[in-house]
Amino acid sequence: MSTRRKLTRAEKKAIEGAISRAKKTDKKQKSAQDSIPYIRMTVDGICQVTQTHFTKMIQFRDINYQLSDNEDKQSIFDGWCDFLNYFDSSVKFQLSFINLTASEETFAQTISIPPQEDGFNSIRDEYTRMLQNQLSKGNNGIVKTKYLTFGIDADNIRVAKTRLERIETDIINNFKRLGVAAEVLNGHDRLKVLHDILRMDSLEPFNFSWDWLPRTGLSTKDFIAPSSFLFNRAKDFRMGKKFCSVSFLQILAPELSDRVLKDFLDIESNIVVNLHVQSVDQVSAIKTIKRTITDLDKSKIEEQKKAVRAGYDMDIIPSDLATYGAEAKKLLADLQSRNQRMFLVTFLILNTADTKRQLDNNIFQTNSIAQKYNCNITTLDYQQEEGMVSSLPLGLNQIEIQRGLTSSGVAIFVPFTTQELFQGHEGALYYGINALSNNLIMVDRKKLKNPNGLILGTPGSGKSFSAKREISNAFLVTDDDIFICDPEAEYQTLVERFNGQTIKLSPTGKGNDGKPCYLNPLDLNLDYSDEDNPLSLKSDFILSLCELIVGSKDGLAPVEKTVIDRCVRLIYQDYLNDPKPENMPILEDLYNALRKQEEKEAQFVATALEIYVSGSLNVFNHRTNEDINSRIVCYDIKELGKQLKKIGMLIVQDQVWNRVTINRAAHKSTRYYIDEFHLLLKEEQTASYSIEIWKRFRKWGGIPTGITQNVKALLSSREVENIFENSDFIYMLNQAAGDRKILAQHLGISPHQLSYVTHSNEGEGLLFYGDTIVPFVDQFPKNTELYRLMTTKPDEQKEVK
């Protein structure tokens, strides 16, 4: 026997509200539900609009049209024409562009950082205020969505379902060819879209379950209908508390710009734009145009006869007649030989506002945009209810004002502008403002297939600042552990503010406090590798270390690799048998094991190792004496000098890998920032090990970020190019001319996109997030504690100290 789940207070409130809207005060009076013209909505998203017309709905995302160069724009435009040509006369479709203001509370929750009991809430509050300030610069308060609703006529829903699903598959595939992400909406999703339009005066979220219908006797309309409709005026109407007006676009210009639709959708108020499109049967269209040409030719002959009778030149005919004749012949040629179809289009705009004056201002603004392109906006006098119905994404057009356009004429209303990167969930971090739309860029690298990242830029472009901003944001928002390899001692101030550890490595072995500070490069965590034997990956690391130590131009010889690998397995035997700290080997154990080998190559490597064991560079010949337990740890290797810096970076990388393996068991992410990353990629074996670690990080919950100004080093070999291929996140700041050329070729950056990293200001560039490319600007407010902690400018750093 099944037990029914108890309704929550919010669910009860939603049902009570629906019941109150369902009650009629007068049997003769229409209810708000009566103005919503569909018969039923099914769970899988099929809407029966009339007895014989059925529709489905697809939401599609944006792509970077405005950011593309002319060649790419033409390619997108041609692809959109092909997309439109798919629809024959049996399939009506509707393009809906819905811009609705989200409640301030909703957006505040999205960007605010929840407090924690760790002593850093003052910085969280400051960061939240910064985000709110950046939010106000754009129109992130407006949620923009795009939909395609398509419908067919059928005898019943069973027949309609099969055909709609086939068309749906074709449309999704056609969107994929354009590089556009799209998904089909189910019944609940469609009802939510209708609810958001019809009840935009309400702050209550959409609350609905199919289970409630049989239990309450309500219909789906009762959960989406506004409190009332009032259609008692010629040019506007009331929908709940909102003042609304529907207008249509009169297309008067012979040619239109591809920016028309974009300009309408850039209006910073609630607006719903719809294009109802009906394909005309190709044979009928051609016949109609031929008939028109024949009629025009007859008129031309009549005019010529009149001219002869009147005694003037028969070639002088009315200019309109000549123009119409030329246009008709061009249209016929388009349909017959230029892959064009004929469409009938109705272009509707629904403006809404809180007051009548504000509504008039919105309509005036809309009309100004239309007039800029030699078009007119005309309100639907005494047809506001029909206009409202036609503005709902149901696939029903009750306005019989249509304009005939060819495929390219319809395609000029390009539905793509710029991609946005705004993920409204708690793990999303701030990366600046979209340079095209002024909207916040907030994303979570963990959502990428491969969260590994690169921060690239010339000196002074803001690389270190950008890294510090992400570090701070990640520390305040997530519980991730954060490690930094710091070759220039730039991160200590920030790390100390977050009560982190700075481990200073120097040739003398003295840390920040003057006490000995050692890291053992031979430290091994038994979970070091996926394999049963953790020594395999550790051996790769030690080979990389020895390659740096030997310093040969050609790397280690095969025999040298063999003897090192043999000795590695020998020196770890005691620890593997009894894994206690005192059994952990150090470099001296490796040195002694090499000395015992007979091969001359072993003696050669041992001799090279000697200075790091008993000579002046023996800082790494000790067991680790630092208890690394902070969430944020900085390895300051500035004082290691040229001889030890690369070795220090490699050892730090290995230490972080040990922490990654520990954190994986705790289901915790580990972020690792490597400044001057190119230094690890110059030697073949070291580069090979770094690339292997780079690949492994993702599987083990690691999020590495390489920071460098040297792009050429990143692309120095086919193997090193794997770093790019395994990095779905690239934060690209200003680039030198040579590097721009390399990056454009490798990442497929268009000349127009490249302009955003050409002589750009500090904190400006391109963000690559998966397949999305967005130009950004990050002007972090200087009057904040965080800015003073993150800046690398000496005069500004003095203020902190």
Description of each model-found segment:
Residues L747-V800:
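Conserved P-loop NTPase
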Residues S2-T418:
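Extended, folded cores of ATP/NTP-driven motor/assembly subunits in large transport
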Residues N499-I503, E719-M732:
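A short helix-turn-beta junction within AAA+ P-loop NTPase domains corresponding to the substrate/partner-engaging
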Residues S466:
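Hydrophobic positions on the alpha1 helix immediately C-terminal to the Walker A/P-loop
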Residues K463:
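Conserved lysine of the Walker
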Residues N473-F483:
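Post-Walker A helix-loop "phosphate-sensing" segment adjacent to the P-loop in P-loop NTPases
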Residues I63, N70-S89, S96-L100, D263-L265, ...:
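P-loop NTPase motor domains
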Residues I455:
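Hydrophobic anchor at the beta1->P-loop junction of P-loop NTPases
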